[in-house]
């Protein structure tokens, strides 16, 4: 599932390509047809993201709410200069076409037209988003410090922190030497503050670069991060391999239905 930085990149891209002008909206698949018809020809006011949720705000009130889930994708394309649009390929839930660019949405968990009040309801269920300037980490800390749930599970709970997925979860805990099974109430406030600030920095890098980069230079053999063979993670999907820091064996287990990865030597 795409993590939060991906949705913020999409919001920035769609803001740049479509905002401020009328947009043609359709639903070749048909499942979004009624809403698409009501949106067609409206001006996109802005695009925004909160965690793993994308919002397209149109002049006049309607907001398209998208959650990609496990399988959703946007395919971006440049509008041909001859005026002919490409035929939709596959099950396109929503197609947006602007003056110079188009995008096709396939396979989302959610694609719906809602109003501002319903947007507020969605956001009210979410924790702070590290990529938003209005993020309030104290609300996440207040939930974590009272919880007996493992910190590895709490980080994936979108009501605690919005936008963190399995890669950032595993890598953040490794970088701060925290066992994913440790109860939330066993996390000290200085540990939380350091991890939050690190998460903000890591996700900003992901937003800027378009990929998750978490390995520190001292563990990366001095290679620049754009090399194709660069080690991209410390523990994620590295079960049975040696730890990049201590040489111990990376372990994996299920934690509330999701795979968690950690180094039993480095993380306590």
Swiss-Prot record:
Belongs to the FPG family. It catalyses: 2'-deoxyribonucleotide-(2'-deoxyribose 5'-phosphate)-2'-deoxyribonucleotide-DNA = a 3'-end 2'-deoxyribonucleotide-(2,3-dehydro-2,3-deoxyribose 5'-phosphate)-DNA + a 5'-end 5'-phospho-2'-deoxyribonucleoside-DNA + H(+). Its cofactor is Zn(2+). This is Endonuclease 8 1. SMART domains: Fapy_DNA_glyco, H2TH. Its EC number is 3.2.2.-, 4.2.99.18. Induction: Expressed in mid-log phase. Involved in base excision repair of DNA damaged by oxidation or by mutagenic agents. DNA glycosylase that recognizes and removes damaged pyrimidines. Excises Tg:A (thymine glycol, prefers 5R isomers), Tg:G, 5,6-dihydrouracil:G base pairs and urea:A, also excises oxidized purine derivatives guanidinohydantoin:C and spiroiminodihydantoin:C. Poorly cleaves dsDNA with uracil substitutions, thus also acting as a weak uracil-DNA glycosylase. Acts on DNA bubble and 3'-fork structures, suggesting a role in replication-associated DNA repair. Keywords: DNA damage, DNA repair, DNA-binding, Glycosidase, Hydrolase, Lyase, Metal-binding, Multifunctional enzyme, Zinc, Zinc-finger. Binds 1 zinc ion per subunit. GO terms for biological process: base-excision repair; cellular response to oxidative stress; DNA repair; nucleotide-excision repair; response to oxidative stress. PROSITE patterns: ZF_FPG_1, ZF_FPG_2. InterPro entries: DNA_glyclase/AP_lyase_DNA-bd, DNA_glyclase_Znf_dom_DNA_BS, FPG_cat, MutM-like_N-ter, Ribosomal_uS13-like_H2TH, Znf_DNA_glyclase/AP_lyase, Znf_FPG/IleRS. Disulfide bonds: none annotated. SUPFAM superfamilies: Glucocorticoid receptor-like (DNA-binding domain) (SSF57716), N-terminal domain of MutM-like DNA repair proteins (SSF81624), S13-like H2TH domain (SSF46946). GO terms for molecular function: class I DNA-(apurinic or apyrimidinic site) endonuclease activity; damaged DNA binding; DNA-(apurinic or apyrimidinic site) endonuclease activity; double-stranded DNA binding; oxidized purine nucleobase lesion DNA N-glycosylase activity; oxidized pyrimidine nucleobase lesion DNA N-glycosylase activity; single-stranded DNA binding; uracil DNA N-glycosylase activity. It comes from Mycobacterium tuberculosis (strain ATCC 25618 / H37Rv). It comes from the Bacteria.
């Amino acid at each position: 599932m795409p993590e939060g930085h991906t949705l913020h990149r999409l919001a920035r891209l769609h803001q740049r390509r479509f905002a401020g002008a009328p947009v043609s909206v359709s639903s070749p698949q048909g499942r979004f047809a009624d809403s698409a018809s009501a949106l067609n020809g409206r001006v996109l006011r802005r695009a925004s993201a909160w965690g793993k949720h994308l919002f397209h705000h149109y002049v006049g009130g309607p907001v398209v709410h998208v959650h990609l889930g496990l399988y959703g994708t946007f395919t971006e394309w440049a509008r041909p200069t001859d005026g002919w649009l490409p035929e939709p390929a596959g099950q396109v839930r929503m197609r947006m076409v602007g003056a110079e660019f188009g995008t096709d949405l396939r396979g989302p968990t959610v694609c719906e037209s809602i109003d501002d009040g319903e947007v507020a309801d969605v956001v009210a269920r979410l924790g702070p988003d590290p990529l938003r300037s209005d993020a309030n980490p104290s609300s996440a800390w207040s939930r974590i410090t009272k919880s007996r749930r493992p910190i590895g599970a709490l980080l994936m709970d979108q009501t605690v922190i919005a936008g963190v997925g399995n890669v950032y979860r595993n890598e953040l805990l490794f970088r701060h030497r925290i066992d994913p099974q440790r109860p939330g109430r066993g996390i000290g406030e200085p540990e939380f503050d350091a991890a939050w600030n690190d998460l903000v920095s890591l996700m900003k890098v992901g937003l800027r670069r378009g990929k998750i980069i978490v390995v520190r230079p001292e563990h990366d053999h001095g290679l620049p991060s754009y090399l194709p063979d660069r080690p991209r993670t410390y523990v994620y999907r590295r079960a049975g391999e040696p730890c990049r820091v201590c040489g111990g064996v990376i372990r994996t287990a299920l934690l509330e239905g999701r795979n968690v990865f950690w180094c039993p030597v480095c993380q306590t």
